[in-house]
Amino acid sequence: MAMFYAHAFGGYDENLHAFPGISSTVANDVRKYSVVSVYNNKYDIVKDKYMWCYSYVNKRYIGALLPMFECNEYLQIGDPIHDLEGNQISIVTYRHKNYYALSGIGYESLDLCLEGVGIHHHTLEAGNAVYGKVQHDYSTIKEKAKEMNSLSPGPIIDYHVWIGDCVCQVTAVDVHGKEIMRMRFKKGAVLPIPNLVKVKLGEENDTVNLSTSISALLNSGGGTIEVTSKEERVDYVLMKRLESIRHLWSVVYDHFDVVNGKERCYVHMHSSNQSPMLSTVKTNLYMKTMGACLQMDYMEALEYLSELKESGGRSPRPELPEFEYPDGVEDAGSIERLAEEFFSRSELQADEPVNFCNSINVKHTSVSAKQLRTRIRQQLPSILSSFANTDGGYLFIGVDNNTHKVVGFTVGQDYLKLVESDIEKYIKRLRVVHFCEKKEDIKYACRFIKVYKPGEETTSTYVCAIKVERCCCAVFADWPESWYMDTSGSMKKYSPDEWVSHIKF
């Protein structure tokens, strides 16, 4: 009976046949199959399109162009692959979106000793040519080759694998980037999306690393996390971590299976693609309530973004009507009007009472000069984006939240310029995802109002007043904490625009 061992699970054996992704007791020529079977489901091999797959094992690189089949169901590493007669011919190893490689004797291959050399993988963009370690348009590459021809060749230090839609190439370069060798395969291929991530528990930020890995794999079609731990009971430590972050999973249809081992555990991630949104740890979309600015969970974010998409954005908010407010009235409209008048003041008095409180459109806070820039960095993005996502509002820094009196903060002019620069910087970093045609920027105004004390003619005490208007579309305080696996095996974070583009409205 043929046996197959996945390299991803430590299955490399130098005494067995080795192919990209597997060691096996048999050497199957997988080029001869046109149909394969996985769990009694039949899948056609894709014609004239291949996957470049590779393993790093014992300082050895094993790479090859392999056949692939299309499957819309999630398959795990190690799942058996059979021919139509019921004979096992391979196991699941590599995946690119909905395509799975068939590991065994494939087409063009590359077997290297990695002692003293590196190897890098690239997607060859359509229309580009290659020289050594760079790709560009043909004329630029031609000039590059002429420039490098004058250099004497040196020993190879790096190999570069270029995978394109119509052709694949392997180049080797010396320390100066001079191309020493080139192989060209007239076959179109894709690179696999790595679907194995290693996490070690007991190290700093291990919970963050685990949640990031889960998000990245779920958003990339699934995969496996290999978990080790500094502690003896790796399975116990893992389950504690998973339980502590279970509330983060924004995709209820996604799930995982845990396979326990003595020294390591494997968490198999399965994404069914039934959820309307990506797996996300934090949306970084905030809304303002009466008492706080709250981060939207994924359902709130979906509802909010769906409304914006349906309406094509929001129109500017009309100006507040002018009218007098009876004593003691503290409705949202009167509070906002009083805040607007306070914002327009040219000067303030220390310990002056403020006749409005925090509301959905107003927030005031106090902070020492020493902590001012730190608090601005930590809190400004979420507060101002929450105003922009609601109906606009005012932030006053230097008003005591308990006594509702003006206290201000005392700083010099140079420091004040730094604070003003910080505020501008953090507002410009806010990301707006537009559903409208105008695509306007965030509108805001910032003032530093002098605070005078009785008997003092000059002052360097201020209240910082920031006014933010309602934004036409969705304002993100930062990029969503939602990741995916790229073809190099790195975890990348979705930009706000990318994240929204993946929502199934």
Curated annotation (Swiss-Prot):
Reaction(s) catalysed (UniProt annotation): 2',3'-cGAMP + H2O = Gp(2'-5')Ap(3') + H(+)
Biological processes annotated in GO: symbiont-mediated suppression of host innate immune response
Induction profile: Expressed in the early phase of the viral replicative cycle.
Main EC class the enzyme belongs to: hydrolase
Region annotated Schlafen-like, chain positions: 239-505
Annotated EC: 3.1.-.-
UniProt free text on domains: The substrate binding site is formed by the N-terminus of a monomer and the C-terminus of the opposite monomer.
Function: Nuclease that is responsible for viral evasion of host cGAS-STING innate immunity. Cleaves 2',3'-cGAMP which is produced by host cGAS following recognition of cytosolic DNA and blocks the subsequent 2',3'-cGAMP-mediated activation of TMEM173/STING, which normally spreads to adjacent cells and activates the interferon and NF-kappa-B immune responses.
SUBUNIT field: Homodimer.
Note: In some poxviruses, the poxin is expressed as a poxin-schlafen fusion protein.
Protein's name in the database: Poxin-Schlafen
Species: Cowpox virus (strain Brighton Red)
Species lineage: Viruses, Varidnaviria, Bamfordvirae, Nucleocytoviricota, Pokkesviricetes
